[in-house]
A protein has these predicted regions:
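GST-like domain detector, emphasizing the conserved glutathione-binding G-site
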Residues: 1-143
């Protein structure tokens, strides 16, 4: 392409090159599930689907802190999503998080159940739900 020819993006972008490398299977340039796989659901209201990555651990730490201060309803079941094996692209996980990224959580104490994904959004949701660890109003909330 020379400088005098303007770039015109295609109407539908398609990935034409296979990814390579060690971590190629944890990201994809397209959305949607690659396979059917139901997610397990335990006995507690909160179901966390994650892996022990920095973002995954953040949510687990907050849930444990909520339990430590005696917050009723903060009990949870944690389920391993092995991103190295592509678990995040299963239909059950994609139903919760269409971005196919960990962590993701489902709150079954609401009707219908609330799907929350991305670590920051989950942490804010939990702080608001349990009125703990974050100011709820005013400048303190922004700071």
């Amino acid at each position: 392409m020379n400088d005098s020819t303007p770039y015109v993006p295609p109407m539908v972008w398609q990935w034409e090159q296979e990814s390579e490398g060690r971590f190629a299977n944890i990201n994809r340039p397209v959305a949607g599930p690659t396979h059917d796989k139901e997610l397990p659901v335990g006995k507690h209201p909160l179901q966390l689907y994650s892996l022990a990555t920095p973002n995954g651990v953040k949510v687990t730490m907050l849930l444990e802190e909520l339990l430590a201060i005696g917050k009723e309803g903060a009990e949870y079941d944690a389920w391993l999503i092995n991103i190295g094996q592509g678990d995040q692209f299963g239909s059950g996980f994609v139903d919760i998080n269409p971005n196919s990224k960990i962590p993701a959580m489902v709150d079954h104490s609401t009707a219908p159940p609330t799907r929350v994904f991305e670590s920051g959004a989950i942490m804010l949701y939990l702080a608001e739900k349990f009125e703990a660890f974050a100011p709820m109003q005013g400048p303190e909330r922004a700071e």
